[in-house]
Structure formats: structure tokens, C-alpha cells
UniProtKB/Swiss-Prot annotation:
Native source species: Apis mellifera ligustica (Common honeybee)
Family statement: Belongs to the G-protein coupled receptor 1 family.
Matching PROSITE patterns: G_PROTEIN_RECEP_F1_2
Transmembrane segments: 16-36, 44-64, 73-93, 123-143
Organism superkingdom: Eukaryota
Name the UniProt record assigns to this protein: Olfactory receptor-like protein HbA1
GO MF annotation list: G protein-coupled receptor activity; olfactory receptor activity
Amino acid sequence: AICNPLLYSVAMSQRLCIQLVVGPYVIGLMNTMTHTTNAFCLPFCGPNVINPFFCDMSPFLSLVCADTRLNKLAVFIVAGAVGVFSGPTILISYIYILMAILRMSADGRCRTFSTCSSHPTAAFISYGTLFFIYVHPSATFSLDLNKVVSVFYTAVIPMLNPFIC
């Protein structure tokens, strides 16, 4: 829409719009089903209590009585795959948008930057906190720190979204 506004209605066919809506849902479902299927195969040692903000895989795995290295590896691989595929896609689109903005007049550039700069800010904050939670070595794992960060990406970022965007 910013790079080629006159071609937008041609490029964004109904089929592409449906794919762009359905695709993330399918990927999210596959991500969730991977973790859910793995969780049902794990042995648990009686009643235990965890202290997370919400039931996430990392604290959940601390309740397991068996070796969880493969499960932690699966969490890391799935989170890494989501980041590897979606991160560069977003980054490349931002580069194209930035190049289109830099070709505009000074007045148009100023208005466009003031309108569009909030989205990359929200995306980078969100991706940063998610990578902090899911893609870090287990040696630096801290449930209390993860709890603070998870509150940030589940409550603070969505609350700030109307103000940012």
C-alpha cells in the first residue's frame, strides 16, 4: 500500500487476503498442537505448583519427572522456526516501506514516518520479549524474570497497542 499504492488493489486479490489471514492461524495451530501433543506424552510426579503468570511451556516442563531436554529442544526449534520465517519477512517489508518513504517529498516523508513508525516499534518490542522468553539458554532460565517478561508481552504491549498504532 505504501510502496505501490496504485497497484495495491490489483496485488491484494481476495485469494491472497484469505491466505494472509488463514496462514498465521494454521501456523499457530501447528505450533500449539506440537506443544500440546508433547505435553500429553510426559510423566508428571503428583500434585505440583508452579508460579507463572500463565501456563507456558517452560514452567510447565519443570513439573515433569523425566528428562525434558528433547521437549525443551522442541520449544526452542519451534520458536526459532517461527522467528526465522516471520522475522525476516517483516524486516524485508519494513526495508521496502522505508525505501518507498525515503523517495517521498520531505512533507510526505514526515507525515508517513509519524503514521508508520509506531508499527515497527510495537513489532520490535513484541518480538524482543518473545525471543527473550523462548530463545535463550536454559542456564540463564529464571521463572521470576520470565514471569515479568510474560506479563509485559501478554498485558502491557496489547494495552499500549491502541496508543502506539
